[in-house]
Regions:
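Conserved SAM/SAH-binding beta-strand->alpha-helix loop
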Residues: 69-71
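A short glycine-rich, Lys/Arg-flanked "PGG" loop and its adjoining helix->strand segment in the class I
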Residues: 121-132
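Conserved SAM-binding strand-loop segment of SAM-dependent methyltransferases
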Residues: 84-96
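Conserved class I S-adenosyl-L-methionine
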Residues: 1-37, 40-48
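Conserved SAM-binding loop
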Residues: 76-77
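A short SAM/SAH-binding and catalytic strip from SAM-dependent methyltransferases
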Residues: 106-120
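Conserved beta-strand signature within the Rossmann-like core of class I S-adenosyl-L-methionine
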Residues: 133-141
Length: 207
């Protein structure tokens, strides 16, 4: 399988203007899944325009936000400058298929991030960056029978199921808290309805 989600792909994506969704509000699952957590250190793996990272920082977390696109990070930092939480944010330009952080985090999250590697391998990789007792939050595109694609993303590379994600987690190491699949609609450019099919997995690392 080939993977087109390289740096050039994401720089083009973020240079497209409003359609790249840099000004969108944070993902609605974020508040629901983290409301009971004590703020600590967090990694946003594939932070894009920074909405989720900024939201976390605004709620007391110290966030490392990593993305392969310098254009995305520039937009995110500009947005953060008016948030009142920029001192709790660190922006890192990184290829998440090869980069490794120098610490583990109380929360590792990713929202619709697609590096140049198989999707499930990516989730397995970032799971290793969660500290004992910490939380992994994955929000991704749901693969459903009969689907033909999700936006500009090749379906086979961009979508998963909750069962496929949790199957990669050793039951001795993880407690699965959430493993949901949702269908929702958001308003896109020009007021058009955009259907989304989401996978939401939250797990706590036991050790």
């Amino acid at each position: 399988m080939t993977h087109g989600f390289d740096k050039d792909f994401w720089e083009r994506h973020w240079q497209q203007g409003p359609g790249s969704m840099g000004g969108n509000p944070p993902n609605p699952y974020l508040a629901r899944e983290t409301s009971g957590l004590t703020p600590g250190t967090a990694l946003d793996a594939g932070c894009g325009g920074g909405a989720e990272a900024i939201w976390l920082a605004s709620h007391g977390w110290h966030v490392t936000a990593a993305d392969i696109s310098s254009e995305a990070l520039a937009r995110a930092a500009e947005r953060a400058a008016t948030s009142g939480a920029s001192e709790r944010l660190r922006w890192v330009e990184a290829d998440l298929s090869v980069w490794r952080p120098d610490e583990r985090f109380d929360l590792v999250m990713t929202h619709y991030a697609h590096p140049a590697m198989p999707q499930l391998d990516f989730y397995h990789r970032i799971a290793g960056w969660v500290a004992p007792g910490g939380t992994l939050l994955i929000v991704g595109h749901l693969h459903t029978p009969g689907s033909t694609g999700h936006g500009h993303h090749p379906l086979a590379e961009a979508s998963v199921t909750s069962a496929a994600v949790t199957a990669r987690m050793d039951g001795m190491d993880w407690e699965i808290v959430t493993a949901d699949e949702h269908f929702r609609t958001l308003t896109g450019d020009g007021g058009r309805a955009v259907p989304l099919q989401d996978v939401v997995v939250r797990a706590t690392r036991r050790r």
